[in-house]
Amino acid sequence: MPSRTEREKMLAGEAYNCLDADLELERQKVKRLLRLYNLAEAAAERQTILRQMLGRVGRESIIEPPFYCVYGQHIHLGDHVYLNVLCTILDCNQVRTGHHATIGP
């Protein structure tokens, strides 16, 4: 049986090495995108970055900056989702919202 990657173990909810080089590269990539996202003033620019960063961004979904996550690609937002300021999602596994969800203060 071939051995699984640390990412596969992580997504299966098993013990994994968080210091794995591939996982570190993924985290560094999302950190760069988060920096751009949190500094962007135009909503259209933020939407473009979100679509690069997250697994799915539903129609008319908004995340108010600043926003933080670990990997980004494991986050799937339904349609008409609103995440308020300072939202942090630790997406070491899949995180999915339904439609019309609101998260935050």
How would you label these PLM feature ranges?
Residues M1-E60:
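Terminal amphipathic alpha-helical/low-complexity segments used for targeting or macromolecular assembly
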Residues E14-A15, L19-D20, Y71-Q73, N93:
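Solvent-exposed, flexible loop/coil residues
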Residues L33-L34, M53-L54, Q73-L77, V81:
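Short amphipathic alpha-helical patches
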